From Swiss-Prot:
Highest taxon of source: Archaea
Name by which UniProt lists this protein: Ketol-acid reductoisomerase (NADP(+))
Keywords linked to the UniProt accession: Amino-acid biosynthesis, Branched-chain amino acid biosynthesis, Magnesium, Metal-binding, NADP, Oxidoreductase
Family designation: Belongs to the ketol-acid reductoisomerase family.
Cofactor binding remark: Binds 2 magnesium ions per subunit.
Catalytic activity annotation: (2R)-2,3-dihydroxy-3-methylbutanoate + NADP(+) = (2S)-2-acetolactate + NADPH + H(+); (2R,3R)-2,3-dihydroxy-3-methylpentanoate + NADP(+) = (S)-2-ethyl-2-hydroxy-3-oxobutanoate + NADPH + H(+)
Origin species: Saccharolobus islandicus (strain Y.G.57.14 / Yellowstone #1) (Sulfolobus islandicus)
Pfam families per UniProt: KARI_C, KARI_N
Residues annotated as binding Mg(2+) 1: 194, 198
Active site: 111
C-alpha cells in the first residue's frame, strides 16, 4: 500500500508567486463562484470568463467580480482555470480558449478527466496543473470566509517553467485549501479514483444498494413506508457518523445487534463476486472504455441518463420518499 509522505499547508505556499498575474476563472457555477471570490479576497487579480451574458454574468457582477466573454478573459490571462463541467471543456477549449490564449499561459483544472483522456491536448509551452478541492463550491467558500479551508489534491501534468508546483500551491492557498492540507497526486490517479468512487459507491453503488434493499422488503410484504425508513432515510445518520468519527466511531455508536449483523451479513452481501465486479469497473475506467462510452453518450443527448432519471423519479421508493418528506421535516428542530 502506497501512502503520500507529504501534505502541503500554508507554510509550503506563497501567494507572491502569482501576485500580479491575471487569473481567468472559466465558469461561475458552484466551484467557479467560490474560487473566484476566494482568490479575489486573497488579493489576487481575477476575472471570470463566460460564454454568454445571463444569470451567471449578473451574479458575478453582483459579487464584485468582473465578467468577460471567454475569448476576452483568456487573451490577457496568465493563468486559465477550467471550472465548467467536464463535457463542456473540450468544446470551450477548441472554440474559445486555444485560439485566443496568450503563449505560455498556465492551464489549471479541478478534475483530471479532460487531460487524462486527452480530450484537451495543451500546448507544450504551458504549465498544466490541478487543484481538486474535496468539497462542493459553497463549502469551499463558507470555510474560507470562516478562516478555514477544504482539503484538496494537487497534481502537475506539465512543468515547463519549473515552478508549476509553487504556482499550484499558491492557487490552493488562494482558495483556502492549504489551511487544511493539500495532498499530492497525479491526473491519472485523481481521475480514475474519482470516477471509481462515483460509480461503485457514491452514486451507482449506494443507489442500487438502497433500491435493492427497499424492493426486497416490499416484495416480502413489508409496508413501503417502513421499508423506506429502514433502507434509505436512516442512511444519512450513519454517513454523518462515518464523516465525523470514522467507521470505528460509527460502529461504536450503533447497537451491539447492529454491529454483529453488519459484520456478519455485510460480508455475505458484499462478497467476493461484488469485489470482482468492482475491479472490472475499475478496469473499464483505466482502459478508457468508460470515457469513450460517456463521450459518445453525451454526444447523443445522454439518453441513458435521461431514461434512468425518469425511472428513478417514477419508482415506488421515490414516491414514498416524497410522501414522507413532510413527516421527516416536521420533526426537525427549528433553528
Amino acid at each position: 500500500m502506497k501512502s503520500t509522505s507529504k501534505i502541503y499547508t500554508d507554510k509550503d505556499s506563497n501567494l507572491d508567486v502569482i501576485k500580479g498575474k491575471r487569473i481567468a476563472v472559466l465558469g461561475y457555477g458552484s466551484q467557479g463562484r467560490a474560487w473566484a471570490q476566494n482568490l479575489r479576497d486573497s488579493g489576487l487579480n481575477v476575472v471570470v470568463g463566460l460564454e454568454r451574458e445571463g444569470k451567471s454574468w449578473e451574479l458575478a457582477k453582483s459579487d464584485g467580480i468582473i465578467p468577460l466573454h471567454t475569448k476576452d478573459a483568456v487573451k490577457d490571462a496568465d493563468i486559465i482555470v477550467f471550472l465548467v463541467p467536464d463535457m463542456v471543456q473540450r468544446t470551450l477549449w477548441l472554440e474559445s480558449v486555444q485560439p485566443y490564449m496568450k503563449k505560455g499561459a498556465d492551464l489549471v483544472f479541478a478534475h483530471g478527466f479532460n487531460i487524462h483522456y486527452k480530450l484537451i491536448e495543451p500546448p507544450k509551452d504551458s504549465d498544466v496543473y490541478m487543484i481538486a478541492p474535496k468539497g462542493p463550491g459553497p463549502t469551499v467558500r463558507e470555510y474560507y470566509k470562516a478562516g478555514g479551508g477544504v482539503p484538496a489534491l494537487v497534481a502537475i501534468q506539465q512543468d515547463v517553467s519549473g515552478t508549476a508546483l509553487q504556482k499550484a500551491l499558491a492557487i490552493a492557498k488562494g482558495i483556502g485549501a492549504t489551511r487544511a492540507g493539500v495532498i499530492p497526486t497525479t491526473f491519472k490517479e485523481e481521475t480514475e479514483t474519482d470516477l471509481f468512487g462515483e460509480q461503485v459507491i457514491l452514486v451507482g453503488g449506494i443507489m442500487e444498494l438502497m433500491k435493492a434493499a427497499f424492493e426486497t422488503l416490499v416484495e416480502e410484504g413489508y409496508q413501503p413506508e417502513v421499508a423506506y425508513f429502514e433502507t434509505i432515510n436512516e442512511l444519512k445518520m450513519l454517513v454523518d457518523l462515518v464523516y465525523e468519527k470514522g467507521i470505528t466511531g460509527m460502529l461504536k455508536a450503533v447497537s451491539d445487534t447492529a454491529k454483529y449483523g453488519g459484520m456478519t451479513v455485510g460480508k455475505f452481501v458484499i462478497n467476493e463476486d461484488v469485489r470482482k465486479r468492482m475491479k472490472e469497473a475499475l478496469q473499464r475506467i483505466k482502459s478508457g472504455k468508460f470515457a469513450e462510452e460517456w463521450v459518445e453518450e453525451y454526444g447523443r443527448g445522454m439518453p441513458t441518463v435521461v431514461n434512468g432519471l425518469s425511472q428513478v423519479q417514477n419508482s415506488l421508493e421515490e414516491k414514498i420518499g416524497n410522501q414522507l418528506k413532510d413527516l421527516i421535516q416536521k420533526g426537525k428542530p427549528k433553528s
